[in-house]
Design a protein with these regions (language model features):
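Histidine-centered catalytic/metal-binding microenvironments
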Residues: 453-559
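Short, well-ordered beta-strand elements within core beta-sheets of diverse protein domains
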Residues: 122-128
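Positively charged n-region of N-terminal signal peptides that target proteins for export
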Residues: 1-4
Length: 559
């Protein structure tokens, strides 16, 4: 039996930057695409789309890296002879990367004193790798050479053929990192949400290349390779006194990010929510998701009960635990209008007992999110699409931006506004205006939002498929790039125009707690132009009961 030695270790709870990723293999998708999703949830993260053009670099050229969070100078590293174009989190070869942070155990959670942080590890890798396997090799080389200045992370990797989950943590005061990467089996989906998920994993055998360690990366392109890991991932834990069992029984997650109540309820529960809506038989993991460490553990991947299209994947990123005991629309915290959002802090105490609000996939503090779609049957510039949205996933619109795009739409452009500077032309601020207004009377207003959301996304998906088919045979690179720019920018402009109309309609329709009558997208008036008297639906009966229980003697009507 393996034995985990956990004394004198502090386990981090929910990280400040809490995100959600879904990973969909080629065989699990409806059209042979691969998908990864990423919701960048942070109270300080602004929604914008980074662009870095491809470039040739002279000998001796260097790259200065600034910390992804603090923007402080981190490290300067040599440039290779050539780097690839990157649009957000996907490059010109349809390699896409997402992440979620889990921190891990002390003293590894702070990372090396110097080195590359997780954000720059993503961006530098996208500039240097063409597929998932190259990405694993590049990431290992970067952290081994320059150090890893962050704690525990889970990365999602996708290219047109494969999807992988890659988990890593620093070695603390010792330079470098320990990590494990596993290929998601074809036909399956995987996910992670701020909790390490790879437990035991296949290790190197004498007559098999199914699993290789970092000393054997020369074999990484062999098709049978399905697991890759740092050669000292077990040895390092043993040297630190954190594990003393057999190498074959070693669990990466249990050693470097042991389960806690918050790791289950605030993190694993989000993966459960995705699996629960996509696969059969997930009820058995409900107790685990709700915080029972002794319950049956959620598997690393599951086989979905249907093939997933791009809109199915978008839908899986829109969830408040509806239909489960954790449904955020149903408890008293949702208020009379069933608002599934809770302001921070998440935890609270009453009469000496501790409680927690749920942490759902859809949350108010999302800076941006995306669905990255990779399609091997199309030219790379056209095949890779980052369906990009800002703010809350439940009320965002995913706009198609091609990986071959060279002109980012103004509404997503870097520098167009910030968390401390409002911009009328920034999608982030417009979508926040709409979402935050909806939180006032959520159950009614969100339906108006979803109607326009569906209108736009249905059109965008249909138009994108037709557009890709029409331009798949284009051999003039310059003409193709111009068309990609036009298509993506036109959709972004249409989205902004339609969302401004929605913003104005919501204000007119719902101002002051009223609900004005609407017909054919316009506020109804009488023949003389006077607005019809609005609807004023009462609060639900249970809410009136709470008012009476709390203040009934003061509010009671007397004769």
């Amino acid at each position: 039996m393996k034995r985990l030695i956990l004394f004198a270790m502090l386990v981090c709870t929910l990280p400040a930057l809490a995100c959600t990723n879904l990973i969909v293999s080629k065989g699990a998708s409806a059209d042979g695409s691969t998908f990864i999703t990423y919701a960048a949830d942070s109270h300080t993260r602004y929604g914008q789309l980074r662009y870095c053009p491809a470039a040739d670099h002279p000998e001796g050229a260097t790259l200065k890296l600034y910390n992804y969070g603090s923007l402080k100078f981190q490290i300067e590293i040599p440039q290779p002879a050539h780097t690839y174009q990157v649009v957000g989190f996907i490059n010109e070869h349809q390699l896409a990367i997402g992440e979620t942070t889990w921190g891990g155990i002390s003293p590894l959670d702070k990372g090396n004193a110097e080195g590359i942080d997780y954000g720059n590890l993503i961006y530098v890798t996208l500039q240097r790798a063409r597929n998932c396997r190259e990405a694993i090799k590049v990431m290992h080389e970067l952290v081994s050479t320059y150090g890893y200045a962050d704690g525990g992370e889970s990365f999602s990797l996708a290219d047109p053929n494969e999807v992988w989950i890659f988990e890593i943590t620093s070695k603390g005061s010792e330079k470098g990192a320990v990590w494990v990467a596993r290929r998601v089996p074809d036909g399956y989906i995987c996910g992670h949400a701020n909790q390490a998920r790879i437990t035991t994993f296949p290790q190197m055998g004498k007559e098999s290349y199914k699993s290789i360690d970092s000393r054997n990366l020369k074999y990484i392109d062999r098709p049978e390779v399905e697991c890759v890991y740092a050669s000292d991932v077990v040895k390092f834990a043993k040297q630190r006194g954190w594990y003393s069992g057999k190498d074959a029984d070693f669990s990466f997650a249990d050693t470097y990010n042991p389960l806690t109540f918050s790791g289950l309820r605030a993190c694993e529960a989000r993966v459960y929510a995705m699996f629960n809506r996509a696969a059969d038989g997930m009820k058995r993991y409900e107790a685990y998701a709700m915080g029972d460490k002794n319950a049956e553990r959620l598997p690393l991947w599951v086989k979905p009960n249907r093939k997933l299209g791009v809109q199915d994947v978008m839908a899986l990123m829109r969830d408040h635990y509806e239909g489960t005991p954790m449904d955020m629309t149903q408890d008293v915290g949702a208020g009379p209008f069933h608002c599934p959002y809770r302001w921070r802090p998440m935890d609270f105490e009453v009469d000496g007992k501790k409680y927690v609000h749920e942490r759902a996939i859809s949350t108010q503090q999302t800076g941006f999110s995306f669905v990255a779609q990779c399609r091997g049957w199309l030219p790379s510039k056209l095949g890779g699409v980052i369906w990009f949205g800002v703010d809350d996933t439940y009320s965002t619109v995913y706009c198609p931006i091609y990986c071959g795009t060279t002109q980012i739409p103004v509404c997503f452009e870097e520098g167009n506004g910030s968390m401390s500077r409002y911009s009328e032309t920034a999608a982030f601020w417009l979508f926040n205006r709409v979402a935050n207004f909806c939180y006032l009377r959520y159950d009614v207003m969100i339906k108006d939002v979803q109607k326009v959301q569906k209108e736009l996304e249905d059109a965008f998906v249909k138009e994108e498929v037709a557009h890709a088919e029409r331009w798949a045979q284009e051999d003039n690179d310059r003409r193709l790039i111009g068309e990609l720019n036009r298509f993506s920018n036109d959709r972004a402009e249409r989205m902004m125009r339609r969302w401004r109309e929605l913003d104005q309609m919501l204000l007119m329709k719902y101002i002051d707690g009223n609900i004005k009558h609407e017909k054919d997208g316009k506020i109804e008036t009488t023949e003389t132009g006077v607005v019809r008297f609005p609807q004023q639906p009462p609060y639900p009966a249970w809410f009136y009961r709470q008012i009476v229980d709390d203040k009934g003697e003061v509010l009671r009507v007397t004769e």
